[in-house]
Amino acid sequence: MALSHLPVGAQAGLMDTPALTALLSQTSFGASLAPETRARLAALGRVIDLAKGHVVIHQGTPSRDLGLLVSGRIAMRLGLPGERDRTIQTLEAGDVFGWSTLLPSAIATSTGITLAPSRAILFEGSSLRTAIAIDSELATAIYHRLFASVARRLEPNRTV
């Protein structure tokens, strides 16, 4: 089930744009954004609190939200045919999840499960895609940070 539908174990935190902008500035993802860009991004977000063991995204299903982990931990697991799911990465505060929502197929490539009570900022996919289509500064900032995140996640898997 998509996070945008507030599944069992999730609570939406009501937060106005200035408060969400301040929260975003405390993350590694949002701290270096220009203040105006950070405010525009914050206007698209909402805060969600998640219980331990909550599935935030499920492999093979539509990815509807881009999430930014504010606190807690999320195990990203990959399901392989005939095998148990494997944890391929553990996300920490400042990491993003659900980036598939920005791709044309928007299908999740892994499953994310909270390892502890967690808080995240969610950006609904269609609203975010519309915003980056009309705001090149916002698009550049988001894509730059997403590519950096992907590169960080791939680094431990490099073999020489």
For each feature predicted by the language model, list its residue ranges.
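Cytosolic regulatory regions built on CNB/CRP/Popeye-like sensor folds
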Residues: M1-V160
